[in-house]
Curated annotation (Swiss-Prot):
Residues 68-113 are annotated as: Disordered. It is found in: Mitochondrion membrane. The gene is Cox10. This is Protoheme IX farnesyltransferase, mitochondrial. GO terms for molecular function: geranylgeranyl diphosphate synthase activity; protoheme IX farnesyltransferase activity. One of its GO terms (cellular component) is mitochondrion. It is a multi-pass membrane protein. PANTHER family: PROTOHEME IX FARNESYLTRANSFERASE, MITOCHONDRIAL (PTHR43448:SF2). Its EC number is 2.5.1.141. Keywords: Heme biosynthesis, Lipid metabolism, Membrane, Mitochondrion, Transferase, Transit peptide, Transmembrane, Transmembrane helix. NCBIfam families: cyoE_ctaB. Converts protoheme IX and farnesyl diphosphate to heme O.
Length: 443
């Protein structure tokens, strides 16, 4: 039976299509080696990556030969989309020529799940990123600090807390000037110099002991010992070179009583106050005693005795430090807590505010006691009452509000309150021959 023309044309078309498909498959099989490039990644010692240039498919095979030890450091390039990346046949051949040829593995492809393979690759990338970050951190951490001779005076000034030392010397000078008797300039200079050296020594030893804790606080993390600008040996040597001549000047240049007070204050600050800061809130009261001794030293340097006037000056400095320091520590509670210090503002905030207010009011009573002890005239408690009432008002606001704003106001008020109060005391100082006329202002 003869086939119809339609059947003959269908068979011819089917044969032509089949021949074309066979020809294309043969060309694809012959060109496959030119489209495959072996790319090695530092994923594992037992895996090799094969990347198909047409579809960017990654396959993993088991490494059989120990000679395949080539490692290429991965470059931090963002991965390109497989649907947007097109590689020409010429570039493929060039990449194939650059890479060495390796024998094909004899074992079949691994049949591990794709999730495990992706996890291996991701783990290698994360490990490499962590290693790079660790190297950069170590480079910053172990950066060499060079000490120049020109920078040494400034470093030693920060080591000795030069501003705090200046405050100590000024209160000592006020105690010397308020003491009865003639003003001896040579004794005054020796007292100021000896007290300043003793203060530098105490502050340097304090920083030496607190290096591990200061590094955790934003307020103290840039101190010289914390940053490694000077060695601990140099800091201790500087403290010794300040303490020995300072105590010698106070003992033999002034009088033994003043020298003994200087030694006691260094011991109290370095061996009692410094370790107590991490143990108990009583460190604040001990620190207030340390700050109250310098005006007493100035009084004993001028008179050679420890009488009621010296104790009154010490009491004024003692009470002034509580609103000053409690207001300061209130704004640094996070820092003190991070550094491991036991402060009233951290552990007993209500007591911190109550003590500050209590000693603000005590300044009024101590100012009233000054003319009773023949240190000043009766004009002093009158003219000092406004500033004492003002700091008491700020202390009350700090007690009621218990916020950072009120503590800052109280702290900045204390900065100008003390020098103004001492200046008023010097202005109203009791002169010889005025004991019977205490109500008149000095001429």
């Amino acid at each position: 039976m003869a086939a119809s023309p339609h059947t003959i044309s269908s068979r011819l078309l089917t044969g032509s299509v089949g021949g074309c498909i066979w020809y294309l498959e043969r060309r694809a099989i012959q060109g496959l080696p030119h489209r495959v490039t072996r790319l090695f990644r530092n994923v594992s010692n037992q895996w090799v990556t094969l990347q198909h240039l047409s579809f960017l498919k990654r396959m993993y095979v088991t490494q059989l030969h120990r000679g395949l030890s080539q490692r290429v450091k991965p470059k931090p390039e963002p991965p390109a989309s497989p649907f947007l990346e097109h590689t020409s046949s010429g570039q493929a051949r060039a990449d194939e020529d650059e890479l060495p040829s390796f024998p094909a593995p004899s074992r079949p492809l691994s049949r591990k799940p794709n999730e495990e393979l992706v996890e291996l690759e991701a783990t290698s990338i994360v490990d490499h990123s962590l290693d790079t970050a660790k190297e950069k951190k170590e480079e910053r951490q172990w950066k060499e600090m060079k000490l120049h001779t020109d920078d040494l005076p400034g470093i030693l000034a920060r080591l000795s807390k030069i501003k705090l030392t200046a405050l100590v010397v000024s209160t000592t000078s006020a105690g010397f000037a308020l003491a009865p008797g003639p003003f001896d300039w040579s004794c005054f200079l020796l007292t100021s110099l000896g007290t300043g050296l003793a203060s530098c020594a105490a502050n340097s030893i304090n920083q030496f002991f607190e290096v591990p804790f200061d590094s955790n606080m934003n307020r103290t993390k840039n101190r010289p010992l914390v940053r490694g600008q000077i060695s601990p040996l140099l800091a201790v040597s500087f403290a010794t070179c300040c303490a020995v001549p300072g105590v010698a000047l106070l003992t033999w240049g002034v009088n033994p009583l003043t020298g003994a007070l200087g030694v006691f204050n260094i011991f109290l600050y370095t061996c009692c106050y410094t370790p107590l800061k991490r143990v108990s809130i009583t460190n604040t009261w001990v620190g207030a005693v340390v700050g109250a001794i310098p005006p007493v030293m100035g009084w004993t340097a001028a008179t050679g005795s420890l009488d009621a006037g010296a104790l009154l000056l010490g009491g004024i400095l003692y009470s002034w430090q509580f609103p000053h320091f409690n207001a300061l520590s209130w704004g640094l509670r996070e820092d003190y807590s991070r550094g491991g210090y036991c402060m009233m503002s951290v552990t007993h905030p209500a007591l911190c505010r109550r003590v500050a207010l209590r000693h603000c009011l005590a300044l009024i009573a101590l100012s009233t006691a000054a003319p009773v002890l023949d240190i000043t005239t009766w004009v002093f408690p009158v003219i000092s009452l406004p500033i004492n009432l003002y700091i008491s008002y700020l202390g009350f606001r700090f007690y009621v509000d218990a916020d950072r704003r009120s503590s800052r106001k109280l702290f900045f008020c204390s900065l100008w309150h003390l020098p103004l109060l001492l200046l008023l005391m010097l202005t109203c100082k009791q002169r010889p021959g005025q004991e019977g006329d205490k109500g008149e202002a000095p001429s």
